Amino acid sequence: PDALKDLKDPRLERHVVDVLDAGQYERFLAGHGAAFCTLGLGEPSKFPREEFKKVDLDGTADFAAACRRQGVTQFLLLTAVGADAKSSIYYVRIKGEVEERVKALGFARASFFRPSMLMTPTNRYGFTQGVFLTLFPLIDPLLVGPLSRFRSITVSDLGKAMVRHAERPGAGVEVLEWKEFQAVLRGTGA
């Protein structure tokens, strides 16, 4: 399905490129102040580790570097709750490594969005995601205090939070999790 087919805003331009080849898209980045990156394979267990790393780490870091070379000053990146370059858990280690690579580029503002469970409108990954899509709405109210960072968020709400956050003033490196997503959506913080 083509998620962009209904977008009619005259300010939008559509370019079909290989996201793993910065040479195909870098010229389109010039003149933009902010870049949003949600590149990733999603369910890491469905792909070989090399492919996951090629997309989620190298592809994302290459996009960030291309943005920086073209003068983008604000980079907003979707990673994952618990992202940590030193983690023994492969998925969160890769997410932590990409955060470190983005930080090293020296953007005036780098915002890392770390959701736990992304609630998608459809099940794209099979049985496991189907279970999580069913259970998380029931479990979310039990995740309080420090556990609230593991609450789910819909893709739509996360997208709104990212855009609203980009529109607010800020600088440096920022990490946003569930609590901060909610504050941005309410217009009260982050």
What are these regions (language model features)?
Residues K8, R27, S45-P48, A80, ...:
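A generic "cationic amphipathic patch" detector
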